[in-house]
Amino acid sequence: MKQTWRWYGPNDPVTLSDVRQAGATGVVTALHHIPNGEIWSIDEIQKRKAIVEEAGLEWSVVESVPIHEDIKTHTGQYDLWIKNYQQTLRNLAQCGIYTVCYNFMPVLDWTRTDLEYVLPDGSKALRFDQIEFAAFELHILKRPGAEADYTAEEIAQAERRFATMSEEDKARLTRNIIAGLPGAEEGYTLDQFRQHLATYKDIDKAKLREHFAYFLKAIIPVADEVGVRMAVHPDDPPRPILGLPRIVSTIEDMQWMVETVNSMANGFTMCTGSYGVRADNDLVDMIKQFGPRIYFTHLRSTLREENPKTFHEAAHLHGDVDMYEVVKAIVEEEHRRKAEGSDDLIPMRPDHGHQMLDDLKKKTNPGYSAIGRLKGLAEVRGVELAIQRAFFSK
């Protein structure tokens, strides 16, 4: 695997020098300062690329070129935004950047309720609490019809939880859900959030798939033409939330994508922490079935709690993800490629580390502090080395 590291640009508290010292050789970044839908110019791409290369690193993966909400709802200037997206892909290819991670999650990107969940050892993790999320949706957002998405017991628990919340607790929960987490390009006030949700009132899973298919049929031929590999990121969490459909959550969704646009440019990001939240997702089987189309991996683990829809981010080698078997399957795919004459390593980044040690005293991007990811990268690197030596050394 090619070891990479997500970097949020010049304002990231983790520097490129830190990244290099961590042992990564590739950088995963994006032009977050460019508004959604606008073209990434060659000049802007080259500026960022030069910064990365001056630090002795390579810009390996774009994460992400965000998709404008008009494209997802098939309204407004969606065709203009698609044309702009096509041009951005051409410009990236002209600059020698050929792997693009993106997602098709409506309204929200990845979602958590607690950004400072304290673990028994004193480090902090990200957490999604199903009951707190229900409390937000039922009693703060007050989304019409939300009760249908919860069990009677969850509704009762959410009511009790909400009754114990201070005003600051309510404000913090609201911020965590709607204000935008690292990598998300959208942040909302509560009223704006309600308005955006309303734009999806007539969009179910089938309709969102229709809009996604329209996007893929416009984008993938351009990607194919210029040599860009599109790697869709799964929904996080991988299930419908807030009455919104989710369409990249299961192996069936992956198969639908391949059947919709059967091009090798139409590929996947294997995010084990997203897909792995669902007990019915067999990560190793996903890798084995779609290995040739896996162009990027996010390796992390989560741990489902008593309510299986509640989870927190576990240490990279613990939790519900069998990281050994996952890494072994990825390495096997790389060796399959090698046997066919390709030296195409799969970029991997350690995802969402715990906030720990002196990072606890620093202002960090949630999930993206340095030391927790350094630990995760070192652990995964060790697993890969052991697998390479045990199964593939001559």
UniProtKB/Swiss-Prot annotation:
* EC number(s) stated in the UniProt entry for this protein: 4.2.1.8
Q: What does this protein do?
A: Catalyzes the dehydration of D-mannonate.
Q: Please state which protein family the record places this protein in.
A: Belongs to the mannonate dehydratase family.
* Cofactor(s) needed: Fe(2+); Mn(2+)
Question: What top-tier enzyme class does this entry carry?
Answer: lyase
What name does this protein carry?
Mannonate dehydratase
- MF GO annotations: ferrous iron binding; manganese ion binding; mannonate dehydratase activity
User: Which Cys pairs are S-S linked?
Assistant: none
Q: Which reaction does it catalyse?
A: D-mannonate = 2-dehydro-3-deoxy-D-gluconate + H2O
